Swiss-Prot record:
Organism from which the protein derives: Drosophila melanogaster
The reaction(s) this protein catalyses: UDP-alpha-D-glucose + 2 NAD(+) + H2O = UDP-alpha-D-glucuronate + 2 NADH + 3 H(+)
Protein known as: UDP-glucose 6-dehydrogenase
Known role: Involved in the biosynthesis of glycosaminoglycans; hyaluronan, chondroitin sulfate and heparan sulfate. Required for wingless signaling in different tissues.
Biological process terms in GO annotation: chondroitin sulfate proteoglycan biosynthetic process; epithelial cell migration, open tracheal system; fibroblast growth factor receptor signaling pathway; glycosaminoglycan biosynthetic process; heparan sulfate proteoglycan biosynthetic process; mesoderm migration involved in gastrulation; segment polarity determination; UDP-glucuronate biosynthetic process
The protein's annotated pathway: Nucleotide-sugar biosynthesis; UDP-alpha-D-glucuronate biosynthesis; UDP-alpha-D-glucuronate from UDP-alpha-D-glucose: step 1/1
Protein encoded by which gene: sgl
């Protein structure tokens, strides 16, 4: 069997790499219009960072895994084609800011219809709205050549960036949706056969196409909902003296609830959660379900509130002004073990501090400096890109980033931040030295013993400037 994947991004790359590793009898070609991206996949420096990905790619590349810009040949030769292109939120027109923009999916479908010379199984890998498969099939059949048959399947990914390789190797389930026809069942069996090379058959769930499409949106909505739920309680904890970590542990020990995704933080980010919930909201609005749309909108609103609230906590704690103060930002990716900055909470934090006149010293072990500057100078973030460039300095190590700063802000939960020499950091910072732990990963008691004024999420905090004027050292 020959497989083609259109789209060499965060989903297509790791998925095809693991598939090639586990299916030596299958030839997989990953194609993309970007020659630069394909050149990176064929080099020693891959276009995305994902733990374990390098090793898998190097083992399979040019054996049964190929990266190419020759989309036409790959489509012609393939028996099965994954569509794994970006589905961003629309930025203009009907559904602006909510609906998924399916222009890349449509483009891929039209390419397949134009190029295909034999029967194809076409698989939605991208996250799409419910009934998107119907649109793809309409395009394929409207341009169908005589004697060519298409089957459309939905096979959403359930990967978490930073653990994608492990998620693929040890998937708790694989979901395949297809048409409830004899031909549809045969197509499902063929895709299932690929996964059965390494996934137990009982972990492969088959549904109709529409259930599969909605399940992906629902999964991300549920995960984001849990984060917003615990973050909402973090505000209550700060106002009452409760500790959100203790609350989360008590709640998570209930077997009906579980402990995953109950870590309070500065907020969720990434390419999926917000985009998919906005898509779900748009679907609900168009189905005349305003109460359902409002319910899921609150998950987004709470996340934005949490990011703003944390940013304001920094300003208020620093005597209600950060003008001309240097602040170190440790971590810019939306989570650890990835270089992805899409919808990262760090952008909101940095934007707020820059608007208040702060100068920022930023360090992230995997995000390229150019990416950080691009994010902070984007028109949606600032109207003064040159001013931002002057106020932001990117560092190659955390110790240079914190030197002579007034405060240190943890925006990403990188493991290396836990093991930093905080005595050395304290000595190099301006006094009083502040730490704002937006990911709750540090030993706050030890930091206080060193001399830091520590603020975190989900513990009662007080206006430190006022208390200090009374000679009181604030506690967490």
């Amino acid at each position: 069997m020959k497989v083609c994947c259109i789209g060499a991004g965060y989903v297509g790359g790791p998925t095809c790499a693991v598939m090639a590793l586990k299916c030596p009898d299958i030839v997989i070609t990953l194609v993309d219009k970007s020659s630069e991206r394909i050149a990176q996949w064929n080099s020693d420096k891959l276009p995305i960072y994902e733990p374990g990905l390098d090793e898998v790619v190097k083992k399979c590349r040019n054996v049964n895994l190929f990266f190419s810009t020759d989309i036409e040949t790959a489509i012609k030769e393939a028996d099965l084609i994954f569509i794994s292109v970006n589905t961003p939120t629309k930025t203009c027109g009907n559904g602006k800011g909510r609906a998924a923009d399916l222009k890349y999916v449509e483009s891929a479908a039209r390419m397949i219809a134009e190029i295909a010379q034999s029967n194809k199984i076409v698989v939605e890998k991208s996250t799409v709205p419910v009934r998107a498969a119907e649109s793809i099939m309409h395009i394929l059949r409207a341009n169908q050549k005589p004697g060519i048959h298409y089957d459309i399947l939905s096979n959403p990914e359930f990967l978490a960036e930073g653990t994608a390789i492990n998620d693929l190797l040890n998937a708790d389930r694989v979901l395949i949706g297809g048409e409830e026809t004899p031909e549809g069942h045969q197509a499902v069996e063929k895709l299932s056969w690929i996964y059965e090379h390494w996934i137990p058959k009982q972990n492969i769930l088959t549904t109709n196409t529409w259930s599969s499409e909605l399940s992906k949106l629902a999964a991300n909505a549920f995960l984001a909902q849990r984060i917003s739920s615990i973050n909402s309680l973090s505000a209550v904890c700060e106002a009452t003296g409760a500790d959100v970590s203790e609350v989360a542990r008590a709640v998570g020990l209930d077997s009906r609830i579980g402990s995953k995704f109950l870590q309070a933080s500065v907020g969720f980010g990434g390419s999926c959660f917000q985009k998919d919930i906005l898509n779900l909201i748009y679907i609900c609005e168009n189905l005349n379900l305003p109460e359902v749309a409002a319910y899921w909108q609150q998950v987004i609103d709470m996340n934005e509130y949490q990011k703003r609230r944390f940013s304001q906590k920094i300003i208020e704690s620093l005597f209600n002004t950060v003008s001309d103060k240097r602040i170190a930002i440790l971590g810019f990716a939306f989570k650890k073990n990835t270089g992805d900055t899409r919808e990262t909470a760090a952008i909101t934090v940095c934007q707020t501090l820059l608007e208040e006149g702060a100068a920022l010293d930023i360090y992230d072990p995997k995000v390229e400096p150019e990416q950080i500057i691009d994010d902070l100078t984007h028109p949606s973030v600032t109207e003064s890109p040159e001013k931002v460039k002057k106020a932001v300095q990117i560092h190659s190590d955390p110790y240079s980033a914190v030197r002579a700063t007034h405060a240190l802000v943890i925006c990403t939960e990188w493991d290396e931040f836990v093991d930093l020499d905080f005595k050395r950091i304290y000595q190099s910072m301006m006094k009083p030295a502040y730490i704002f732990d937006g990911r709750k990963i540090l030993d706050h008691e030890r930091l206080q013993q060193i001399g830091f004024h520590v603020q975190t999420i989900g513990k009662k905090y007080q206006r430190t400037g006022l208390l200090r004027s009374w000679g009181i050292v604030p506690q967490l």
